[in-house]
C-alpha cells in the first residue's frame, strides 16, 4: 500500500459477509420470522426468488428486504477500516455487492462502480425507459403498514407513468444500466488505463466463482499483463490463481478483519 501509485479494490459477497452482514443467521430469523412461518423462506438470497401469489405480498417482502439489507445497517467497521487503509491514495472500487456499504463508509460515489445494481433503486419492470427510482421514501412509508405479510394495494410501487417496477438487481436482460451506470463503467476503464503502467495494487475481497468474469478473472489478467501490478487476494475458499504469468501475487485465507487489523 505504501508503495502503490494506484489502488483498485474489487469486492464480492465475501467482503460483506466478513463485515458481519449475515443474511441467513439469527438476525435474519428474528426480522423475517413472519415470512419464515408463512412461506418457509430460509435466507435473504433464495427468498428473493420466492413465487409470491400476490403483488401485495411480494412488495411487502421486498420492503422488508430492502430495509434489512440497505437502509438499516450503518457502515460496518470493516468497510470503514478499508476506507482508512486506502487513505489519500488514488483509488477506485468495482463491486458486485448491492448493499451500498462502500458509499456509507466514505468512498466517493464517483469512485464506485456497482456493476450489479443497488437495493436502493427500482427500475421499470420491462427495462425501459432506462431510468431508476430511489425507494427509501417508499420503504419508510410502507414498513409500518405491513400486516399479515402484505401491504395495502394502493402502495404497490409503480413508475411515474404508472407502469410496474422491479428491483434494480441484475438477474436477466431487463436490468437497467442507466446513465450513471455507464459513467461509472467509463471511469473504471479510465482508471485502469491510467494505472496500467504504474505501481498498481489490486485488492480483491471475497470474490468467488458466481460472476468471476466481472472482477476475479480481469484482476488476474491485469496482474499478468501489467508488469508493476500486484494482486492481493483475500479469499478463504478460493485463494488460488489460474492465470499464468502473474509476477506479484499474495493471498490470504485468514478472517479478513484479522488480516486488516494486523
Predicted segments — roles?
Residues 1-262:
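Conserved catalytic alpha/beta core of Sir2/sirtuin-type deacylases, generalized to analogous enzyme cores
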Amino acid at each position: 500500500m505504501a508503495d502503490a501509485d494506484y489502488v483498485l479494490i474489487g469486492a464480492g459477497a465475501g467482503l460483506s459477509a466478513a463485515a458481519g452482514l449475515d443474511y441467513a443467521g439469527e438476525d435474519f430469523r428474528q426480522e423475517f420470522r413472519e415470512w419464515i412461518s408463512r412461506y418457509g423462506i430460509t435466507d435473504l438470497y433464495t427468498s428473493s426468488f420466492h413465487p409470491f401469489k400476490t403483488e401485495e405480498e411480494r412488495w411487502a417482502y421486498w420492503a422488508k428486504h430492502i430495509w434489512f439489507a440497505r437502509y438499516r445497517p450503518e457502515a460496518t467497521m470493516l468497510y470503514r477500516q478499508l476506507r482508512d487503509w486506502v487513505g489519500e491514495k488514488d483509488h477506485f472500487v468495482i463491486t458486485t455487492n448491492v448493499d451500498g456499504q462502500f458509499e456509507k463508509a466514505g468512498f466517493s460515489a464517483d469512485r464506485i462502480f456497482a456493476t450489479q445494481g443497488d437495493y436502493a433503486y427500482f427500475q421499470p419492470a420491462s427495462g425501459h425507459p432506462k431510468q431508476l427510482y430511489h425507494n427509501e421514501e417508499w420503504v419508510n412509508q410502507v414498513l409500518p403498514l405491513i400486516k399479515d405479510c402484505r401491504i395495502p394495494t394502493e402502495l404497490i410501487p409503480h413508475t411515474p407513468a404508472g407502469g410496474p417496477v422491479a428491483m434494480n438487481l441484475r438477474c436477466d436482460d431487463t436490468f437497467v444500466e442507466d446513465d450513471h451506470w455507464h459513467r461509472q463503467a467509463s471511469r473504471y476503464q479510465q482508471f485502469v488505463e491510467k494505472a496500467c503502467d504504474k505501481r498498481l495494487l489490486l485488492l480483491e475481497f471475497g470474490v468467488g466463482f458466481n460472476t468471476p468474469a466481472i472482477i476475479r478473472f480481469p484482476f488476474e489478467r491485469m496482474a499478468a499483463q501489467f508488469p508493476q501490478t500486484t494482486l492481493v487476494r483475500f479469499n478463504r475458499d478460493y485463494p488460488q490463481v489460474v492465470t499464468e504469468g502473474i509476477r506479484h501475487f499474495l493471498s490470504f485465507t485468514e478472517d479478513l478483519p484479522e488480516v486488516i487489523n494486523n
